[in-house]
């Protein structure tokens, strides 16, 4: 009996196995319904595993992917491409040499350990950088594409793979901020106040500009920007129109009539209000704000309520207001807090700025009458008549076009106000103000600032920007990965010269980092306004032209070693340009060669041969402007 298996025992064993199998099938994650098609396909792929343990592990990992709708992760760790379709606009690729074993395309893991979408900060950066990604999807073995400068069809291509020059257009240019990157903080039918996105949100290389914000104010004729103060130091510049700006603290009040090219500093905490006193012309003001509380963030505080902003007086309790004004709360509410003040307001209406009726009380920019304009401008001083103004007062206005221009010829002008004892308004901020005017069809020669980082606002006209940067080669990488590694230096890593281009128009902003060469071409008369940061002891250095040419200062023997041509040829080439700083954008005729006829052919051959590799980084930088 011991050696025999009872039929009853055998039947019981079969029933037990069937029960276990049914239980396993019911508990399988594959039977679980999921609304995530990616996770569902993952569960289906797990059924291909022949081993039960591996299949269960696969299904367990698939359930975690249910929280990420963009998942393309294969939990079985297959190195080949999956059957899953990529989201629209994305391209799939197989594993490339150098890829990590833990596939980088898998969803990000949040702090809590669950799989989920990116956080708010990452989503904001991703939205900011939502541009075509074809460049960084290039396989690692492929060389950078040849460069054809934007808008120059028909010209000879330049920047071949051997020259290590790569071009980034406006869409991929982190130094360029088109006007659409402004967001409106206050706006109505009388005007608007817009703030540009934070520079450090665009790229980590702008960390030094974290505490600098650009603001644009636009107001229609005979309008007033209501009084307010802010937790930020401000420097405003009149771009267009005529304004009367009043600045007040607890003991003093000053009003100035400002015209185009005039600047004024408004210290943090000072009450200010801006009047467009012109009858027909709109007012445009550019302002740079430097917050004093939270880096990169500032707030406006209005004593009077409007549709866009409540009065900060409403934040105090009733007892505090009664004690502060030594009056009953009903009177305080009627005079300061309520818009409709009744008959008493009607009696004093002639002495008030405006009746503030519902018709014009639509925001922080209000319409004013001619009588109010005359009253507000009665005691204002002109910039040219400083008279009794105290010397060294940081609230004194600045005329950017006062005196002779720093640089000038028939093709353009440059005015600059530096941070020195003559300009205490800028000295403690270590800032400079620059005004550039480039004639139509002219070029501001390639140059760079030795120390200052300049934020440039396009005030008028159109043009083209070329900015040269030297970066670590970043092929086959996404924009976010490249940004995260911008501040990491690797010894022995390859460097490449990149040309960043942009088409400039009114309202755009671009950044000129220190030591980065820049050239600006004006397709129509172009006016630029620059706010320079870290401006003390800054020098503007040109790479071409008759004067202030740093390449001309390089010794002849060093030129022999650095450039394809000889030192004599380089010096002769430099002397071809008779103008300085601003020149015609049309290249001169190539009919006359700088070399003698006997040596023309061999010199060209030698130069073409050297152009393939170059002799140094200086040559690569110069090539980027071709």
Curated annotation (Swiss-Prot):
Key word NAD present: no
Glycosylation sites recorded in the entry for this protein: 521
Keywords, ordered alphabetically: Allergen, Glycoprotein, Signal
InterPro entries: Cupin_1, RmlC-like_jellyroll, RmlC_Cupin_sf, Seed_Storage-Functional
Comp. bias regions, Basic and acidic residues: 88-113, 120-138, 472-481
Up-regulation conditions: Repressed by water stress.
Example of a GO MF term: IgE binding
SUPFAM superfamilies: RmlC-like cupins
Gene3D superfamilies named among the record's database cross-references: Jelly Rolls (2.60.120.10)
Domain Cupin type-1: 175-333, 398-571
Chain positions covered by the region annotation Disordered: 70-183, 377-405, 472-496, 577-626
Leader sequence segment: 1-25
Bias type Low complexity, positions: 587-596
Family: Belongs to the 7S seed storage protein family.
Official protein name in the record: Allergen Ara h 1, clone P41B
């Amino acid at each position: 009996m011991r050696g025999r298996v009872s039929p009853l025992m055998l039947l019981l064993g079969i029933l037990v196995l069937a029960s276990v199998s049914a239980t396993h099938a019911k508990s399988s994650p594959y039977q679980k319904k999921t609304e995530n098609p990616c996770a569902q396909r993952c569960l289906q792929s797990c059924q291909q595993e022949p081993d039960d343990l591996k299949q269960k592990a696969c299904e367990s990992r698939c359930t975690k992917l249910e929280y990420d709708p963009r998942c393309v992760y294969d939990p079985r760790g297959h190195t080949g491409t999956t059957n899953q379709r990529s989201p629209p606009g994305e391209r799939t690729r197989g594993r490339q040499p150098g890829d990590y074993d833990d596939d980088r395309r898998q969803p990000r893991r949040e702090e809590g350990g669950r799989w989920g979408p990116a956080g708010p900060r990452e989503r904001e950066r991703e939205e900011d950088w939502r541009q075509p990604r074809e460049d960084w999807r290039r396989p690692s073995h492929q060389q950078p594409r040849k460069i054809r400068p934007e808008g120059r069809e028909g010209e000879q291509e330049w920047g071949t793979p051997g020259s290590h020059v790569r071009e980034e257009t406006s869409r991929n240019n982190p130094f360029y901020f088109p006007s659409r990157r402004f967001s409106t903080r206050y706006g109505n039918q009388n005007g608007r106040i817009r703030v540009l996105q934070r520079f450090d949100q665009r790229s980590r290389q702008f960390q030094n500009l974290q505490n600098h914000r650009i603001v644009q104010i636009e107001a229609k004729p005979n309008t007033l920007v209501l009084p307010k103060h802010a937790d930020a130091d401000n420097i405003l510049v009149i771009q267009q129109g005529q304004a009367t700006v009043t600045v007040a603290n607890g003991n003093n009040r000053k009003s100035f009539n400002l015209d185009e090219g005039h600047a004024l500093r408004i210290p943090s905490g000072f009450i200010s209000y801006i009047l467009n006193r012109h009858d027909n012309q709109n007012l445009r003001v550019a302002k740079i704000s430097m917050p004093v509380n939270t880096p990169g963030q500032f707030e406006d505080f209005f004593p009077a309520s409007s549709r866009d902003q409540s009065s900060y007086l409403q934040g105090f309790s009733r007892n505090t207001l009664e004690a502060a004004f030594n009056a009953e709360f009903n009177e305080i509410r009627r005079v300061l807090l309520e818009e409709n003040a009744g008959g008493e307001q009607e009696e004093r209406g002639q002495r008030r700025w405006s009746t503030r009726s519902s018709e014009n009380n639509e925001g922080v920019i209000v319409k004013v009458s001619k009588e109010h304009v005359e009253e507000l401008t009665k005691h204002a001083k002109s910039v040219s008549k400083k008279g009794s103004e105290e010397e060294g007062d940081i609230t004194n206005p600045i005329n950017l076009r006062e005196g002779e221009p720093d640089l000038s010829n028939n093709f353009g002008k440059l005015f600059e106000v530096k941070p020195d004892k003559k300009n205490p308004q800028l000295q403690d901020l270590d800032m400079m103000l620059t005004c550039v005017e480039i004639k139509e069809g002219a070029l501001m020669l390639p140059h760079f600032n030795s120390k200052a980082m300049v934020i440039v606002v396009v005030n008028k006209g159109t043009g083209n920007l070329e900015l040269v940067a030297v970066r670590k080669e970043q092929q086959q990488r996404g924009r976010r990965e490249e940004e995260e590694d911008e501040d990491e230096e690797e010894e022995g890593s390859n460097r490449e010269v990149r040309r960043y281009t942009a088409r400039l128009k009114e309202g755009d902003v671009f950044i000129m980092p220190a030591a980065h060469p820049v050239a600006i071409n004006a397709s129509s008369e172009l006016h630029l306004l620059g706010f320079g940061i870290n401006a003390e002891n800054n020098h503007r250095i040109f790479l071409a032209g008759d004067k202030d040419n740093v390449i001309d200062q390089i010794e002849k023997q060093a030129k022999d070693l650095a450039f394809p041509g000889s030192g004599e040829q380089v010096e002769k080439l430099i002397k071809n340009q008779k103008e300085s700083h601003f020149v015609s954008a049309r290249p001169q005729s190539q009919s006359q060669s700088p070399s003698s006829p006997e040596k023309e052919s061999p010199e060209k051959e030698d130069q073409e041969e050297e152009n393939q590799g170059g002799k140094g980084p200086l040559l690569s930088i110069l090539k980027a402007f071709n």
